[in-house]
Design a protein with these regions (language model features):
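A short, basic N-terminal segment
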Residues: 1-36
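P-loop NTPase nucleotide-binding core
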Residues: 23, 27-148, 153-157
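Sensor-1/coupling segment of RecA-like P-loop NTPase cores
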Residues: 35, 141-143, 147-151, 156-162, ...
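Helix-loop-helix "sensor" segment of P-loop NTPases
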Residues: 191-242, 263-266
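Winged-helix-like regulatory helical subdomains adjacent to P-loop NTPase cores
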Residues: 250-326
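Short amphipathic alpha-helical interaction segments
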Residues: 323-341
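A short, conserved structural fragment
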Residues: 339-349
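Short, amphipathic alpha-helical interaction segments positioned at domain boundaries
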Residues: 357-367
């Protein structure tokens, strides 16, 4: 039996955020969704886009390593979601200097592949980008539909878009379109300093960790659908809630393990929860080890400190002296770096670890 983890948003504790996203999209607004990985960012945006009847175009900005790759990914998303014949007509009439479209013959429904021409020089690539930005509006208007462009991990493009030219142009052009909205997904709600931020402000929705009682209700509802329940005579539920710390992604991972460990009576005891956690940490250990190897040494040290000795004031003199942390800019840089990577929350969440299973693994590793 497969565990069905889709659940009403009311049980996920995100109904207010969901409603706000729907309202903004319905009013032709654009959004920034800020939250750590596993907080439900993409699920919320996808469901909200479907709720307003929009076609969804998704671009993973981690894969967009430069402007050319960004154009390629955007072209792919458009080709996968719109009428191939209309795209072919657009290329023939407006885009043949910069794009080519290859119709796929082995499908009952016409599909095709839209790609930028090879070896475009920087000026041509920029022209291709500006031209492509107008295509979703043309296609959406022809079908009388809305489009929501979801840019996952959006801040990654700033590694090559040093002066925010691509970002500013994208936001300006989409803002002027009547059938297209965009949603930026990031770990923190940082602000930029270019003029487009003032001219075209974003509605920001921040996803904090879920409350314990919300996770408890969600977990009970999910487990009941497959005939499982926490043993009320044990501390199984408390152990589960302590482990996930309001992180829906980690909660899902543990619940999947609990299903595999089911007892004949359907009860989940502390033993099953502990076993599920231990097995999960064992499977994740290579991933966590690799993550630490990619982090600067001062970030690793700070992460270990926050996992083993949580504090609301990592910049305090006492905490710095206790753990041998660097003072001043180096410490602040490490805090900011860990926030950008989605590994810790900021001051508003008391600098707690954002990935509870990573925190648990670090504590076991250092004990």
């Amino acid at each position: 039996m497969n565990l069905e983890l889709s659940t009403p948003l009311e049980l996920m504790g995100r109904s207010a955020e969901f409603q706000r996203i729907v309202e903004v999209l319905a009013e032709d607004g654009d959004l920034l969704i800020a939250g750590v990985p596993g907080s439900g960012r993409r699920t919320l945006v996808r469901r909200a886009a479907l709720a307003v009847g929009a076609i969804i175009l998704e671009i993973d900005c981690i894969r967009a390593t430069d402007g050319e790759r960004f154009v390629q990914l955007m072209a792919e998303a458009i080709a996968q979601n719109f009428d191939a014949v209309k795209i072919q007509d657009w290329v023939a009439s407006s885009g043949k200097e910069f794009f080519r479209f290859q119709m796929q013959e082995n499908s009952s429904i016409p599909t095709g592949k839209l790609t930028p021409m090879r070896s475009l020089n920087p000026k041509q690539l920029w022209q291709a980008f500006e031209l492509l930005l107008g295509l979703p509006q043309i296609l959406a208007a022809s079908e009388n539909q809305r489009v929501v462009i979801i840019l996952q991990s959006f801040p990654h493009i700033r590694s090559w878009d040093r002066h925010s030219l691509w970002e500013a142009t994208f936001r300006r052009e989409i803002n002027q379109q009547t059938h297209v909205n965009y949603v930026l997904i990031a770990t923190i709600a940082e602000t930029t300093h270019h003029s487009e931020e003032t001219n075209y402000p974003l509605e920001t929705v921040q996803l904090a960790p879920l409350a314990r009682d919300v996770v408890a209700v969600w977990a009970r509802e999910i487990l009941q659908t497959v005939g499982l329940t926490f043993d009320s005579r044990s501390k199984a539920m408390q152990l589960f809630l302590d482990a996930v710390q309001g992180h829906i992604g980690d909660a899902v991972a543990i619940i999947r393990r609990l299903q595999a460990l089911r007892r004949p009576d359907g009860l989940i005891t502390e033993q099953e929860v502990q076993q599920a956690i231990e097995e999960l940490l064992k499977d994740l250990s290579i991933t966590f080890e690799s993550l630490l190897m990619l982090l600067p040494g001062n970030q690793v040290h700070l992460l270990e400190c926050l996992a083993t000795d949580p504090t609301e004031k990592p910049q305090s003199r006492e905490y710095i002296q206790k753990h041998g942390l660097s003072r001043g800019g180096s410490l602040q840089g490490a805090l900011t770096g860990l926030q950008h990577k989605g590994l810790i929350y900021g001051a508003e969440q008391r600098y707690q670890m954002a990935l509870p299973l990573l925190a648990l693994w670090l504590r076991q590793r250092l004990s």
